[in-house]
Amino acid sequence: YDDGQCSSYDLEACWWSNIPDADFYWQDNYDWVIGEFVCTGFDYLGEPTPFSQKARSSYFGIVDLCGIPKDRFYLYRSHWRPDTTTVYVLPHWNWPDRVGKEVPVFVYTILETIILQSHQRLLSHREFPYRKAV
C-alpha cells in the first residue's frame, strides 16, 4: 500500500508465494498435497518485503518482532490445531474512519457455523461443511 502498511486481510502475496487460504484449500482438496512450508514464522529485521524502501523488516511472519501473534496466527491455528476451539474476528470494532460504512469482516475458526450479530441484528450466517470441529 502507498502508506507503507500491510493489510491484515492477507489478500496479497509476492510473485513467488501465495496467500495462506490457497495453501489450505490445496491441502484440503488434493490428496497429492501432503503439507506446507511456512518460510517466515516470525517477522525479522532485514529483507523489507513487500516494501523495498523505508522499511526495516520482513512483514510476512505469523508472529511480529515482539512475539505477539498477528491476525493470521489465528488462521493458521484454526487449521493446525483442530483440537483447540479458535474463533477470531478481524478487524477490531473501533475503526474510526469506517463508522457508518461497510467493513469487511473475516472470521478464522474451526467451527462449522458462524453467526455474526450486532445489537441483536443478524449480520451474517455462514456454514462451512468442510470444517470438522473436534
Feature annotation, model-predicted:
Residues Y1-P129, V134:
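Extended substrate-binding grooves/exosites of carbohydrate-active enzymes
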